[in-house]
């Protein structure tokens, strides 16, 4: 059950999350299962101030729950991720692979803001996905690193707090 997996994921960390934070992470795990596959293992969550990246996409969520979200992975993992996501074979990192990462993050965040609107009448908006090339990334707000190990590689997901009013 995704709820059990989710609860176990955070039980051994000091990474306390708000109600919307829990909603976001639970949706993220569900989206990984739905769009990429269930053959993953969540690794330990940690707070970080910076991250080394290779293939990285960022998207901002604006409003009363303002966060920056990042999905990052190495080149080979990005190619395998895109192959699973769009059900089409890729052999090199190109604009289609990058667009797949952007689309997954945009889909995840779009579903999240709809869920927030439906459950709490809070309107959030999304910025456009951005390809990040400067490494390491320096985070200015409290940032959780959520690594997820798939059979084809590790996906690093980051949630950077900007402004949360709850």
Give the predicted meaning of each segment.
Residues 3-166:
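N-terminal auxiliary interaction/assembly segments of multi-subunit proteins
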């Amino acid at each position: 059950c995704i709820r059990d997996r989710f609860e176990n994921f955070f039980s051994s960390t000091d990474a306390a999350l708000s109600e919307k934070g829990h909603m976001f992470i639970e949706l993220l795990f569900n989206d990984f299962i739905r769009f990429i596959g269930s053959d993953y293992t969540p690794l330990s969550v940690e707070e970080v101030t910076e991250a080394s990246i290779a293939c990285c996409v960022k998207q901002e969520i604006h409003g009363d729950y303002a966060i920056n979200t990042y999905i990052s992975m190495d080149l080979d993992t990005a190619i395998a991720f895109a192959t699973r996501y769009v059900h089409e074979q890729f052999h090199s990192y190109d604009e289609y692979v990058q667009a797949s990462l952007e689309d997954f993050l945009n889909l995840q965040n779009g579903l999240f803001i709809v869920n927030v609107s439906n459950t709490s009448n809070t309107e959030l908006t999304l910025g456009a996905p951005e390809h990040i090339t400067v490494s390491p990334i320096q985070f200015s707000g409290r940032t959780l690193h959520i690594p997820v190990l798939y059979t084809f590689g590790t996906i690093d997901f980051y949630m950077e707090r900007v402004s949360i009013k709850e």
